[in-house]
Swiss-Prot record:
Residues 1-54 are annotated as: Disordered. The keyword Nucleotide-binding applies. This is ATP-binding cassette sub-family F member 2. The modification N6-acetyllysine is found at K306. It holds the Pfam family ABC_tran_Xtn. ATP 1 binds at G120, L121, N122, G123, I124, G125, K126, S127. Residues 40-54 have a biased composition (Basic and acidic residues). Belongs to the ABC transporter superfamily. ABCF family. EF3 subfamily. The gene is ABCF2. ATP 2 binds at G432, P433, N434, G435, A436, G437, K438, S439. The modification Phosphoserine is found at S514. The keyword Cell division does not apply. InterPro entries: AAA+_ATPase, ABC_tran_Xtn, ABC_transporter-like_ATP-bd, ABC_transporter-like_CS, ABCF_EF3_subfamily, P-loop_NTPase. It comes from Bos taurus.
């Protein structure tokens, strides 16, 4: 029987629930959308009917695409761990896609309390493996709930805060049931049980926690109350990520979660994921992020999954040591085999004593062969990206003079009275929070946007190449990379010459002649980089070039940028790439641009200090660059 104290507590909650149910006008309070009766909803749906239909069609198209991918995927495996265990061990795991074998007779080991970084080359099947786990095509025990972040939230009239809170279906269901029972006159033990369960779920703190997560991902309080349909796809992806963090599943699968984040949000997410205590499987090509988050690394290579303890740097060190030992063992075995074969050939038909020794060595050789020989270490293919020589043009290449910019006449000012110049020796990384105008600045410099006030002067012969996140959308998906590049650059007549050009960007063999739609996202990015390089620009403006690229490709890109003769401005959430290629860090915020006095690692520490409310140590300039 419930105690008197529990009854009083329930009575208070019951009264509060009744108060919440009193008639209210259609507005928002504390981030929860409060709507008028069904008539208002129907009126709203009618007004937005066409938009809703378009969204539904796009959503269905994505679902159909996922179903086709799932139909083309075949997975086999056997659960080896105890059915009630919180760990998941799968043996004899094989994975094929469109008949191509991605994994063969390997094992998947995911242990509670571990945060795994899944790494491997572009197109090797990392995302496909996550999808197979998320769809439960891999025999994960049913009591382990899985949340796989696959795509952005579709546009809707809901707010980001509502979208995040509604993902916790158990809490939402319990709150609805509690409100219903609160209006019944009789005392109800069921109501007390509901309140006790809600307390276990920290239901009274749910909104605060959802708001904290959204804030960490860059949503201001005002943005948390805007309608989802007013946000871009990148921001809606952040909402989807916030839902994944809010629900706290037992197994969380994240595929490139930093792709749509700025450096501030990346630092926050890194700190947030460090506290994840269940099972996290993360695909990321940011070495810095993998180092900060992961306790283990899974290397997908040669159709196998190989496991390493520690973060990415520890994986590199351990793998190098293991491969050195493997090569020593390989050479020793090959020397032994050569020696025994030579002895057998020389003395196999000699005297009885020598013949017996030769027979003994032949048996030893047969045992070695039967037990399996050490394989030679096969290194990953080394990429060599290339930006052709651009020639010299005298400075100033681009001059920005008293430039101000706003998107609309009555809109907020993005920049105010900018004054700086860039030349062929410029190596700058633009950093700052989302919405500060980093991509906007690149568009102003290329001429895609015009200043509201002031002037941007460019050398008459300067050629600018801008890489941005939507460049893939310009690809003709029905053409192969070879056909697409031949179409874009008709001056290159020989297919073999074009094959060599594309090959430098890591697209070889069948990848060059397969339709672009069949390539992975990382491989499509390589097509875009090849296309951009052969534009032969003097200035490279790179807006998030690392999205979907593997670690080896990012390193090749860094080498190519460092060898490039022209100027470079970079927007990236990859701290390591910035450290490799940038000579200056420019911070975009508060309608201006200031030069950071240290390197990007010092800037990261500054962002970390902001998370805990500390004041940054460096003193920045307060004037334009």
């Amino acid at each position: 029987m419930p105690s008197d104290l529990a009854k009083k507590k329930a009575a208070k909650k019951k009264e509060a629930a009744k108060a919440r149910q009193r008639p209210r006008k259609g507005h928002e309070e504390n981030g929860d959308a409060i709507t008028e009766p069904q008539v208002a909803e129907e009126r709203n749906e009618e007004a937005n009917g066409r938009e809703t239909t378009e969204v539904d069609l796009l959503t269905k198209e994505l679902e159909d695409f996922e179903m086709k991918k799932a139909a083309a995927r075949a997975v086999t495996g056997v659960l080896a761990s105890h059915p009630n265990s919180t760990d998941a061990h799968i043996i004899n795991l094989s994975l094929t896609f469109h008949g191509q074998e991605l994994l063969s007779d390997t094992k998947l080991e995911l242990n509670s309390g571990r945060r795994y970084g899944l790494i491997g080359l572009n197109g090797i099947g990392k995302s496909m493996l996550l999808s197979a786990i998320g769809k439960r095509e891999v025999p994960i025990p049913e009591h382990i709930d899985i949340y796989h972040l696959t795509r952005e939230m579709p546009p809707s009239d809901k707010t980001p805060l509502q979208c995040v809170m509604e993902v916790d279906t158990e809490r939402a269901m319990l709150e609805r049931e509690a409100e219903r029972l609160a209006h019944e006159d009789a005392e109800c033990e069921k109501l007390l049980e509901l309140y006790e369960r809600l307390e276990e779920l920290d239901a009274d703190k749910a909104e605060m926690r959802a708001s904290r997560i959204l804030h960490g991902l860059g949503f201001t309080p005002a943005m948390q109350r805007k309608k989802l349909k007013d946000f871009s796809g990148g921001w809606r992806m952040r909402v989807a990520l916030a839902r994944a963090l809010f629900i706290r599943p037992f197994m969380l699968l994240l595929d490139e979660p930093t792709n749509h984040l700025d450096l501030d949000a990346c630092v926050w997410l890194e700190e947030e994921l460090k506290t994840f205590k269940r099972i996290l499987v993360l695909v990321s090509h940011s070495q810095d992020f993998l180092n900060g988050v992961c306790t283990n690394i899974i290397h997908m290579h040669n159709k196998k999954l190989k496991y390493y303890t520690g973060n990415y740097d520890q994986y590199v060190k351990t793998r190098l040591e293991l491969e050195e030992n493997q090569m020593k063992r390989f050479h020793w075995e090959q020397d032994q085999i050569a020696h025994m074969k030579n002895y057998i050939a020389r003395f196999g038909h000699g005297s009885a004593k020598l013949a017996r020794q030769a027979q003994s060595k032949e048996k030893t050789l047969q045992k070695m062969m039967a037990s399996g020989l050490t394989e030679r270490v096969v290194s990953d293919k080394t990429l060599s990206f290339y930006f052709p020589p651009c020639g010299k043009i005298p400075p100033p290449v681009i001059m920005v003079q008293n430039v101000s910019f706003k998107y609309t006449k009555d809109g907020p000012c993005i920049y105010n009275n900018l004054e700086f110049g860039i030349d062929l020796d410029t190596r700058v990384a633009l950093v700052g929070p989302n919405g500060a105008g980093k991509s906007t600045l690149l568009k102003l410099l290329t001429g895609e946007l015009l200043p509201t006030d002031g002037m941007i002067r460019k050398h008459s012969h300067v050629k600018i190449g801008r890489y941005h996140q939507h460049l893939q959308e310009q690809l003709d998906l029905d053409l192969s990379p070879l056909e697409y590049m031949m179409k874009c650059y008709p001056e290159i007549k020989e297919k073999e010459e074009m094959r060599k050009i594309i090959g430098r960007y890591g697209l070889t063999g069948k990848q060059q002649v397969s339709p672009i739609r069949n390539l992975s996202d990382g491989q499509k990015c390589r097509v875009c980089l090849a296309w951009l390089a052969w534009q032969n620009p003097h200035m490279l403006f790179l807006d998030e070039p690392t999205n979907h690229l593997d670690i080896e490709t990012i390193d090749a890109l860094a080498d190519a940028i460092n060898d490039f003769e022209g100027g470079m401005m970079l927007v990236s959430h990859d701290f390591r790439l910035i450290q490799q290629v940038a000579q200056e860090i420019w911070v975009c915020e508060k309608q201006t641009i200031t030069k950071w006095p240290g390197d990007i690692l010092a800037y990261k520490e500054h962002l970390k200090s902001k998370l805990v409310g500390e004041e940054p140590q460096p003193t920045r300039r307060t004037h334009n660059v």
